[in-house]
Amino acid sequence: MELFSANYEENTRALDDLLGVGRCFDMISRDLYVGGRRARMWVVDGYGDDAVIERMLSFWLPLRDVSDAQTMQQFIDRYITFNEVNAEKSVKNTVTSVFLGKMALLVEGYDECALIDAKQYPARGVEEPSSGKVLRGAHDGFIETLVANAALLRRRIRDPQLTLEGHKVSDCSRADVVLCYLENKVDRKLLDEVRQKLAKIDVRSVSMSQESIAEAMMGKQQWWTPFPKVRYTERPDAATACVMEGDIVVLVDNSPAAMILPTHFFDFVQEANDFYFPPLIGTYLRILRIVVFLLTMFITPVWFLLVKDPARTQAGLEFLAIDSDYSVPLLVQLLLAEFIVDLLKLASLNTPDVFSNSFSMLGALVLGDFAVQAHWLVPEVLAYMAFVAIANFAQPSYELGYAFKLLRLMLLLLVGALDWIGLVLGCIVIVVLLAATKPIVGKGYLYPLCPLDKKALLALLVRKPISRDNT
């Protein structure tokens, strides 16, 4: 059955069967009389706003006659006082809408169903996200409810040019996806490209929210590159700034993060804290972040290259040499330290909050001391790996941090096998990977360096003062 008919019993049987009435404990179905006519309503328990539903029932039940409404649309106009309601002819669309949280109402004598958007999803408060914290500025954050996230953006951009364009993705989850952009700022060609990629997504479910959508939009052609193709933020102020700059912010229901398109490599230099400090300090923080990017990737491979040959540390670089004896090969020590850092990260993620801080500190101290006492690691290896671990948290993207880790491991292995030639070869591989990586949409991944846009590159490296043209 694709469309509702004038047969009330047939319509109710079809909806009962498709919605799982009797099979699903949380599917509520109630019979009632409205104006002397039989009627039935369906709603998922936990989705419906009880106060709204109660008010509507208290209005419908006393009705004596609704014969003046010849169609469901006329019934809606005269007897449903709620704002968000529409008549639906399709059975499939009705079922999907109920699973999305709407209440369905069938009334005898009509060949359409009323869909009332009286949903109220379970939601947490808009507290500040655990990542991307700022010293000053707003301390709210996105949550798992799409409507609330859209309201956080609307509250900051009170402009009629702001468009929140709704889409549905996947066959099974039917996830709500919203594109947020400014009509007078967005690149229309880029916007059309995003729409086309969303329309072509052919997956049953996007249970992992943005990551599932990002992978579906990218396809399989870029699986070999470790660099992230999208930026994520849980901060409404950061998402607002991107929209104001002409970017597209993608919100997905059930996700507390916003996806920012287009994304280029140098976009990761920026962070929300830059704009809560004066321009000079913001510029310093960006330059510091770039230096940290380079050190994170190269400090351990370069140090390993220098200490492999004692002669290289005699020309004013004696402080880099290893004083203590060691039995485990230095390359194995560095790799072991890398894996221990990841082990501590994974363990802290799965540790209850009450114990996580103390566990991280004690775990690092105990493991580090044990490794030195057992002659597994020399103190210099621990010192450099501690710097790398701290530096990873100085940049705002977890994905980029793990990309640097994989490239750092590659450099260590190449240096161990080929000495300085391995370092040069590894640098060439990194440059080729960066040049070959393609963003989901937009210009090249290395924009604004390649293709060169001096003005855009300067804006990324230097935090300019706020002005009318630079907001």
Regions found by a protein language model. Give the residues of each.
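Membrane-embedded alpha-helical signal segments
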Residues: 1-302, 306, 310-313, 319, ...
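Hydrophobic alpha-helical transmembrane segments of membrane transport and translocation systems
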Residues: 379-381, 385-471
